[in-house]
Amino acid sequence: MNLRIAGMGWVTPLGRGIDPVWDRLIRGDEATGQQISDDIADKTYRAFRIPAGALKDLPPHPRLRRASAISRFAAAAGLDALAQARSTIGEIDVQRMALVFAVSNGGVIYTKRFYHNVVESGAQSASPLLFPETVFNAPASHLAAILGIAGASYTLVGDGAVGLLAIKMASDLLDNEAFDFCLVVGAEEADWLLCDAYHKWRLLKSEAPIEPFHERPRGMILSEGAGAVLLARQGTVQIDAIDAGGNFSQRRKVNEILRRILHDLTDEHACIVASANGTFVDLAERAAIEKELPKAIVYGPKPALGESVGASALWQVIVAAQALRTKRLPEMLHSGRQAGLSFPTIDETSCTKAIVLSCGLNQQVAGLRLSI
């Protein structure tokens, strides 16, 4: 497999940009929860939101004039990934570039507004301005139009693992000689409705922080943002292997799939970027790591950045790539002291490979391995 990361873009609750966000993670910074409320109920929740000003330099494209938050996040991350790639590998022909967009919950804010009008005033009140933003592929459509991509553009809908499955699809696309590049973008927006749903599923906690790898899961905090990687045949970081994993219908099956993925991707020189988020995922990942790679250094970005669902796996890939590039990993925040895992120290890491484990909350598990 000759698949490399040529450029990356990052829009997070800690800011925008690969180096600025990475520097904050290395310093031990973490996002601050903001209160989310809604007129339909008195209950409030906490979520990690994108800071004001993070999107201030987006181009004044007509497509973004009325675009939803998720579309704007995706556009910012995608454009940043392209800009970084151009600075490292040179000019990029967008006519030979495909686009794969990964999403989980989609444009919830505009969808809620659209159906609220319908329920309140009848079908005749349905807004033709809001409807285009309610479909899952709206961000991909906007980004393709901004970049001038007239060919292959796909949207994958899944859970927290969908970003890795999007990279697998991009790898398949790049086997076609018609493409030299594939831009993979994952994005999510936070809303009260999502918080309420995850709360009802007993996956959400009322206040930060996210506490990973504790013996009794304590819940997660939702976040929003986007991550993007431009895949090409040139670049510093190489994707050695992608494991599309599998689906689980029962939580007790998660550990079995994670162990198989780790077994297939195992490398004694690899660190692990986990998807631990304060839910059942943590214990499943811990058990698999203890069995397959017990000495590996383990880091998870979600205590600092939150659970961004559709964007989360791309964020993990960016963290893994940065760890290989800088030879450092941030501190593992709020982790259980008796977790039985090896967490990063302030010293440089000697890892030359990085394994990304991504376990979603709705039945999907996947993984990949990077090297430099």
Residue ranges of predicted features:
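Short beta->alpha junction loops
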Residues: 155-160
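Conserved "HGTGT" condensation-loop signature of ketosynthase/thiolase-family condensing enzymes
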Residues: 1-152, 164, 172-176, 187, ...
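Internal active-site segments that recognize and position negatively charged phosphoryl groups
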Residues: 169
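Alpha-to-beta junction loops
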Residues: 178-180
